[in-house]
């Protein structure tokens, strides 16, 4: 397993992306809390992310994992890579994702790499531009991946056969 990756009781891959300490200033001083950003995936095209907040780190991680499991989305993959290039925004974070030839590996940094690892993508070229805020990068990555359509879905929407669509 990759560094920081675990497998849950339900067989899903879990990955912790970031933990952040936050403070709320009150009359008597500061109250500290923690936030956690996690991704979970089945390694076969389903992925979800979660953001949890709590006074203690383990509780924040647990909340994030539960939210990630509850919001899993399906991504149509083409074997170990993506079907076609995708660009997606969230806030001022912009992500490019492009299919790669077999043996390339995951060429992506930071939060994007964790998403691809739990999703089951093995060969991809990806770049994040603009804001590198992990929450926005993960959201842009997952939304971009979920926005991809399979050839069957495109053919059905256009009222054509898959052969006509794929040429």
Swiss-Prot record:
Write out the GO biological process terms.
translation
Q: Where is the S5 DRBM domain?
A: 12-75
Looking at the UniProt record for this protein, which Gene Ontology cellular component terms does it annotate, in alphabetical order?
small ribosomal subunit
Recorded GO MF terms: rRNA binding; structural constituent of ribosome
**InterPro entries with a match to the protein in the record:** Ribosomal_Su5_D2-typ_SF (IPR020568), Ribosomal_uS5 (IPR000851), Ribosomal_uS5_bac-type (IPR005712), Ribosomal_uS5_C (IPR005324), Ribosomal_uS5_N (IPR013810), Ribosomal_uS5_N_CS (IPR018192), Ribsml_uS5_D2-typ_fold_subgr (IPR014721)
Top-rank taxon, per record:
Bacteria
Record keywords: Ribonucleoprotein, Ribosomal protein, RNA-binding, rRNA-binding
Task: Establish whether keyword Ribosomal protein is in the entry.
Answer: yes
Q: Carries keyword Ribonucleoprotein?
A: yes
NCBIfam families on file:
rpsE_bact
Assembly, in brief, is: Part of the 30S ribosomal subunit. Contacts proteins S4 and S8.
Q: What is known of its domains?
A: The N-terminal domain interacts with the head of the 30S subunit; the C-terminal domain interacts with the body and contacts protein S4. The interaction surface between S4 and S5 is involved in control of translational fidelity.
Entry protein name: Small ribosomal subunit protein uS5
Q: What is the taxonomic lineage of the source species? A: Bacteria, Pseudomonadati, Pseudomonadota, Gammaproteobacteria, Chromatiales
């Amino acid at each position: 397993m990759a560094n920081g990756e675990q497998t849950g009781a339900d067989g899903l891959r879990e990955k912790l992306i970031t933990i952040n300490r936050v403070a709320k200033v009150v009359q008597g001083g500061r109250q500290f809390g923690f936030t956690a950003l996690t991704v979970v995936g089945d390694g076969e095209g389903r992925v979800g992310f979660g953001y949890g907040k709590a006074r203690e780190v383990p509780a924040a991680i647990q909340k994030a994992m539960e939210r990630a499991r509850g919001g899993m989305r399906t991504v149509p993959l083409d074997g170990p890579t993506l079907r076609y290039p995708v660009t997606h925004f969230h806030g001022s974070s912009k992500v490019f994702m492009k299919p790669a030839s077999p043996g390339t590996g995951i060429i992506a940094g930071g939060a994007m790499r964790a998403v691809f690892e739990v999703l089951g993508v093995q060969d991809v070229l990806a770049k994040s531009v603009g804001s590198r805020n992990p929450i926005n990068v993960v959201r842009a990555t997952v939304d971009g991946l979920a926005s991809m359509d399979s050839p069957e879905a495109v053919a059905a929407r256009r009222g054509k056969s898959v052969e006509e669509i794929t040429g």
